[in-house]
Amino acid sequence: MGTRREARERAVQFLFQYDLNPPANVDEALDQFWDSQRTAALAEDKGPATWGEKIELPPPTAEESAARVFAEPLIRGAIEHQNEIDEHIKKHAKNWELHRMAAVDRNVLRLAIYEMLYREDIPPVVSINEAVDIAKKFSTQDSGKFVNGILDKIKGELMRPAREIK
C-alpha cells in the first residue's frame, strides 16, 4: 500500500473520531492519534504487552513521517471547511440526512471533497478512486457506490480538469 493511501486511511480514521467525539484541542488529539498508531504498529510487530510493561516508542519511520506530513493538512483542511463540505454532501445525497449517513461514509466524503475543492495538486479522479476504495475497506461494498455517486456529481461542478494537476 502506498504512503498516500495509508495517509488517507489514517485521515479518515481521525476524522471519524473527531466527528463522533470532537476533542477540545485538535493539536493534542493529533499527537495522541499518531502515537496510538505507532503503538498499535509496534504491538503488531512485537506481540501483546504484559500488564505493567512500559513500551517506549521508537522514533517514527520515514514512511510514518511521510504519511503524517501528507495526512495532517488534509485532516485540518477537512475540519476547517467542514460546514461548506457538508453543504456539498447534503446537496448531492438525495434522500439522505447527513446525521443519518454511516459515519465512515460521511468522513470519507469529507476528506475527498476537501481534496477536490482545495487541493489542486491532487486530480479529482484520484480523490474519488481513493475514497471509493477506502469506503469499501472500512464500510460496505454499497458504500463504494454511494461515495462514488456523490463525488462524481461534485466533480461535474468543478471548474478544473478532473485528471490534471494545476
Please report, for each region that a protein language model flagged, where it lies by residue.
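N-terminal interaction/assembly modules
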Residues: 1-166
